[in-house]
Amino acid sequence: VIVLFLAIEDHRIAPARLAGSLHSAGIAVAALCLRDSMLGHSRYPFRLFELPTSRSFRGLAKALEDAVSTSGARWIIPGDEQSVALLQFLRLRRNVAGLSPGSMAVIEASLGNPCFFDACLLKSNTLRLASKLGIKVPRGFTVTSVGEAVARADDLGFPVFLKESFSWAGLGVVSCPDPISVRQAYIVKAKKRTMLPIRDLFRSLLGRHWYPTGTSIDIQSPISGQVVMFCGIAARGHLMGGICATQLECAYPQGPSTAVRICHEPEIAAAAEKMVVALGYSGFISFDFIKPEVGGEPVLIECNARPVPIAHLGARVGVDLGVFLADYLSTGVLPAKQICSQRSLEIILFPASLQPWPGLQGMCRDIPFDDPALIEFHLAMHPDLALAA
């Protein structure tokens, strides 16, 4: 069984770490990525296809066609949001993508229901769908002007978050303690939109209009509690298995986790399964929830239609997501029910695991000793990094 990673961004950890896990599960991994990237330095891909420097969808589609047909891949795993957006674009515009029927069939098998692509990628649409399913979401509004942003923030009560619908790793989120900060944050984001009609024309001419721009801006109330993520693998709207993890440390406020506790959260797993069924989803997926400090239902805050940095850890707690995928691709048979880990493990994630963490003494460290080039690549990118003993 062969799968292809598509990774447009060069720094993502999850695809590189997951490649080893899939290899251990009996899956052969090919990769279409930048050669000088985290995934490009992994020893596990049996074939590395060079991602073109141009971001024209025609060039990217040609590279994808070559990678799929040459490798014999039956499944594509997007490694980042840009890769998700590109695959969705090619699927929806099959008549102009220039892909063979065989490659298009692989894309179709690797994605969810096209009717719900936006709900996989855009935060506003994710929360709208979740709310319809009876899953609790933050109080909030989509806003279209600075005046509306300030008024809605005042309705919610300060502080609030101002969020871009297409963003990741907390980079599109601004914490606003008062009306002035809401106004300033909205103006900054709105400025990027003033030239959008002209920019979109040029992007269309260059074949770069697959990348989402001008997506909605939301105002949301913050929620006190712990971040709990659910990472799973699905096929045809059936969630085969997953793991939950509570965030113990993060890289920066609203940023990615650096240390987690893998745990059993049946209510969160059930909500994730509801979303997967509604999306008709196929592939690796994760959902971030806030578990309120004072009790009550977990609150869904976002969806990531790609592997996240805990995706390869399932084997440590008896729920190997790679094995689920290998079994499905080998047999076409889906497990009768979702299987989630009920074991616990506290672990510092790579690459944070290379650093000393005085407050996290005795915790397991996820270090890719089996793939040392990943360590070397990260250290070369961060030569001043203080290392753990």
What do the PLM-derived regions correspond to, one by one?
Residues 187-255, 262-273, 291-293, 297-299:
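Phosphate-binding site of ATP-dependent enzymes
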Residues 117-216, 236, 266-270:
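Active-site nucleotide/adenylate-binding loops and adjacent lid/helix of ATP-dependent enzymes
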Residues 167-170, 248-260, 304-318:
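Glycine-rich phosphate/pyrophosphate-binding beta-alpha loops
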Residues 277-312:
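Conserved metal-phosphate-binding beta-hairpin within the catalytic cores
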Residues 1-113, 147:
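ATP-binding N-terminal substructure of ATP-dependent carboxylate-amine bond-forming enzymes
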Residues 323-389:
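Peripheral (often C-terminal) accessory segments that flank ATP-dependent C-N-forming ligase machineries
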Residues 164-165, 219-223, 276-280:
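Short Gly/Pro-enriched turn/cap motifs at secondary-structure boundaries
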